[in-house]
């Protein structure tokens, strides 16, 4: 296992030269200097790097790199996943190639050193646009995001490397005991939410959440246990899959769409990511405009099938989407209890609740 890079000060020309040689990127020559361009990030130290090479370095060495360094074990699963990816042939094309990654379980520090694609790619929408209620990408970029997500899911669909590998099923779904522990946590979280913010919600919304909390204990046996026990129709999920996590190509004829920031990667139903992508910050009007939601789900499903996914019907997808809406409609409650602003969690709650109702999720309880 490579040594962990714990700070940007550690990123010296000598270190990068060693990393490049170890990974077969620099057969001759060396790195003479490194130019740093810091990149503000929520929970990591990140920077764009420009190596300066000696004249005898190969012509095809990477011109720009991106590094992120995380503390408190936040990067553990991301490093494990990317290292798993590097062993796959061919590697999944929607993931930015990793050059080097390491995690120290004693200190909780990790790093990922990757190719920098910021010169050829851009985010389809900004966080500011999403929070302003303008989170729908341009049609071509939306299609690219859906295709990239379907590609990720199809690649890892019931993949043998996920059964006993480093990417794991989320704790609440590993067994009944942990599921019921999560139910108790959500029940207590809802109780605190009602006390601090419930007064501003309409009665019918309170009833919707109360009914969900009451039904949660029954969902394990009815919908979840057999799926997780049999590893049925599972894949690698991003699990924080907002549009800000995608990077769309400036020139689609040359490059494809990437998914980034795999910090929350897990083994789950693919609909987990679809709910984040479609239902979390799109209003009812945005989902229904020109059947946008249905078109996205249809495109996703058809892409799965084209990529070889079998024994998964359209009805299966719709059922999973409804099930994940039931699970994720709790997100804004968690957000409010963990310090998110009112504007943030209220917008998310309205979007998720509208989708929950439109898909008649209460009938599954």
Q: Positions of the model-derived regions?
A:
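ATP-binding pocket architecture of kinase catalytic cores
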Residues: 60-80, 84-167
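Extended catalytic cores and adjacent scaffolds of nucleotide/polyanion-binding enzymes
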Residues: 307-318, 326-365
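Short helix/strand-bridging catalytic loops that position acidic/His residues to coordinate divalent metals
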Residues: 128-137, 259-264, 280-284
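Generic recognition of stable, solvent-exposed alpha-helical segments in well-folded globular domains
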Residues: 77, 140, 144-147, 236, ...
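Active-site activation/catalytic loop segments of kinase-like enzymes and analogous catalytic loops
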Residues: 80, 264-308, 325-344
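Active-site acidic catalytic loop and adjacent metal/ATP-binding pocket
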Residues: 40-57, 217-270
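ATP-dependent phospho-/nucleotidyl transfer catalytic cores
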Residues: 125-151, 157-238, 249-252, 365
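Conserved NTP-binding catalytic cores of kinases and kinase-like/nucleotidyltransferase enzymes
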Residues: 1-110, 249-257
């Amino acid at each position: 296992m490579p040594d962990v890079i714990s700070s940007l000060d550690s990123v010296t020309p000598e270190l990068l030269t060693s990393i490049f040689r170890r990974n077969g990127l620099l057969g001759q020559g060396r790195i003479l200097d490194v130019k740093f361009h810091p990149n503000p990030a929520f929970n990591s130290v990140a920077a764009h790097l420009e190596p300066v090479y000696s004249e005898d370095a190969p012509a095809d060495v990477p011109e720009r790199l991106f590094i992120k360094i995380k503390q408190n074990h936040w990067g553990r699963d991301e490093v494990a996943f990317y290292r798993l990816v590097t062993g796959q042939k061919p590697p999944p094309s929607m993931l930015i190639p990793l050059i080097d990654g390491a995690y120290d379980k004693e200190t909780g520090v990790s790093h990922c050193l990757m190719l920098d694609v910021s010169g050829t790619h851009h985010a389809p929408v900004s966080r500011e646009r999403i929070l302003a209620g303008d989170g729908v990408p341009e049609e071509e970029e939306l299609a690219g995001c859906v295709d990239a997500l379907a590609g990720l899911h199809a690649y890892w669909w019931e993949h043998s490397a996920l059964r006993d590998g480093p990417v794991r099923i989320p704790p609440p779904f590993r067994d009944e005991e942990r599921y019921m522990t999560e139910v108790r946590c959500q029940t207590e979280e809802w109780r605190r939410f009602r006390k601090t913010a419930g007064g501003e919600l309409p009665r019918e919304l309170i009833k919707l959440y109360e009914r969900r909390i009451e039904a949660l204990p029954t969902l394990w046996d009815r919908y979840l246990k057999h799926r997780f026990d049999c590893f049925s129709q599972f894949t690698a999920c991003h699990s924080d899959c907002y549009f800000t996590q995608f990077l769309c190509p400036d020139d689609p004829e040359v490059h494809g769409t990437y998914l980034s920031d795999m910090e929350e990667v897990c083994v789950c139903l693919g609909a987990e990511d679809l709910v984040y992508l479609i239902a979390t910050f799109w209003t009812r009007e945005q989902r229904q405009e020109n059947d946008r939601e249905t078109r996205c789900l249809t495109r996703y499903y058809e892409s799965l099938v084209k990529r070889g996914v079998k024994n998964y019907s359209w009805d299966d997808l719709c059922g999973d989407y409804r099930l994940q809406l039931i699970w994720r409609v709790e997100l804004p409650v968690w957000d409010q209890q963990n310090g998110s602003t009112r504007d943030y969690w209220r917008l998310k709650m309205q979007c998720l609740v509208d989708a929950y109702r439109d898909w008649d999720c209460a009938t599954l309880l």
